[in-house]
Regions:
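Alpha-helical transmembrane segments and their immediate interhelical/interface regions
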Residues: 49-82
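Transmembrane alpha-helical segments in integral membrane proteins
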Residues: 67-80, 146-169
Length: 172
């Protein structure tokens, strides 16, 4: 989605209904890139003989998903920097990472997935609004979302800095 959206944005206006639709589709599927991190919780049920293999396999999938997710996020970040202030772009990316973190919670603990936006929007909206309107009833929502937000945010800062360091190396 990210490469498709990026290519489209170079030739078309982002503010059209097509641009908004493509951006919403990208945003809808972005949390899937990071979700696999939460599969680490299944390693505790793995037999001792397979734990190294399972860990290596899971981390390789997680690495690829995270990297692809951050590439897409970086593309979007660069486009935002062309259109809005630097501070607003950073805040917008932070909000996207917060939404991704909340989506990971929804998928891992409430078992919602991307397609439920289409096949069961009322049920999804109920669960989301219930947790947003009554956060004290669902402390796991806050702690899980915050944990993933800190993890995803700090990892993205490293990726952002790494891209800029490598860019500076090429200029030298």
């Amino acid at each position: 989605f990210a490469a498709w959206l990026r290519k489209w944005m170079f030739t078309q206006r982002w503010q059209t209904w097509q641009g908004i639709t493509r951006t919403m589709l990208w945003l809808l599927f972005l949390p899937n890139a990071f979700y696999i991190i939460s599969d680490i919780m299944h390693l505790k049920t793995t037999s001792t003989s397979n734990v190294l293999y399972d860990t290596a396999l899971l981390l390789s999938f997680a690495w690829n998903g995270i990297l692809l997710g951050y590439i897409g996020l970086y593309y979007m970040h660069r486009q935002l920097l062309l259109r809005i202030s630097r501070r607003s772009a950073h805040v917008f990316i932070g909000v996207i990472l917060l939404l991704c973190s909340f989506a990971i919670y929804l998928g891992r603990f409430l078992r919602w997935n991307t397609w439920d936006v289409v096949v069961n929007p009322a049920g999804l909206l109920f669960d989301v609004s219930d947790r947003v309107l009554r956060p004290s009833v669902y402390p796991q929502t806050f702690t899980t979302t915050l944990t993933f937000f800190v993890l995803l945010g700090s990892m993205y800062v490293v990726v952002w800095q790494l891209i800029h360091v490598l860019g500076d190396e090429e200029k030298a």
